[in-house]
């Protein structure tokens, strides 16, 4: 009987330690990064930036090309330190409609299980929820209560690497910006780069009997 009690106490102790650890990690996760990192993030993510992105619907890649599609995002900052990520009139490949998305995001530290996945120095996380999803590119709102649309991303402020996923919570549509290094000079070549993507997409459709 005594051994059963000791075993029970041991299990309870382990559980309490686990809960305490999770709580502590959750608190850490909500803390903003060091001010130095936030300053760097503001310098990196500022204005229009072209990134390669895949658009998926129910898990099916609608951009079709392994290199993704050149996509122009906009990043602006508010006085409270939050960042608004915008994507205006986005449609690509075989997507049946254009999407405008705006979401207010906050930066935070990585939690304990994210750090082993990104052991290099400089990584921070940014998240946003209830983003505004619309087909109206003129809608200025950066939130839509209860929309369920979200942003989950990571930025390395030392290497300029970025990756993030936008979940529109609509028809299982997501845009996945896979890990890549930000190159701000792509903005100057955006039109030509997008035209090349459209040519490559047309060839892909032809090769796959869709053109």
Model-predicted segments: where are they?
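Sparse, context-dependent recognition of short Cys/His-centered cofactor- or disulfide-binding micro-motifs
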Residues: 2, 7, 70-72
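Generic serine detector
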Residues: 3, 20-24, 52, 58, ...
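Bacterial Sec-dependent N-terminal signal peptides
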Residues: 3-6, 16-49, 168-211
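A taxonomically broad motif for mature regions of secreted/extracellular
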Residues: 41-45, 50-57, 61-74, 83-104, ...
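Polybasic, proline/glycine-rich intrinsically disordered low-complexity segments
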Residues: 124-170, 174-186
């Amino acid at each position: 009987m005594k051994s059963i009690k000791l075993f029970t106490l041991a299990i309870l102790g382990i559980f309490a330690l686990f809960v305490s650890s999770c709580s502590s990690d959750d608190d850490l996760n909500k803390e903003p990064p060091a001010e130095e990192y936030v300053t760097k993030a503001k310098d990196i993510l500022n204005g229009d930036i072209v990134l390669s992105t895949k658009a998926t619907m129910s898990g099916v890649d609608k951009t079709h090309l392994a290199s993704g599609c050149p996509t122009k995002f906009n990043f602006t900052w508010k006085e409270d330190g939050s960042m608004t990520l915008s994507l205006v009139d986005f449609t690509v490949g075989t997507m049946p409609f254009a999407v405008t998305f705006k979401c207010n995001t906050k930066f935070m530290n990585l939690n304990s299980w994210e750090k082993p996945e990104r052991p290099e120095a400089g990584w921070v996380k940014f998240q946003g929820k209830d983003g505004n999803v619309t087909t109206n590119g003129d809608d200025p709102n950066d939130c839509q209560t209860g929309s369920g649309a979200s942003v989950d991303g990571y930025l390395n402020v030392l290497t300029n690497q970025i990756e993030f996923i936008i979940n529109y919570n609509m028809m299982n549509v997501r845009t996945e910006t896979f890990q890549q290094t930000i190159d701000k000079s792509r903005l100057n070549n955006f039109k030509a780069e997008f035209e090349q993507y459209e040519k490559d997409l047309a060839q892909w459709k032809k090769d796959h009997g869709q053109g």
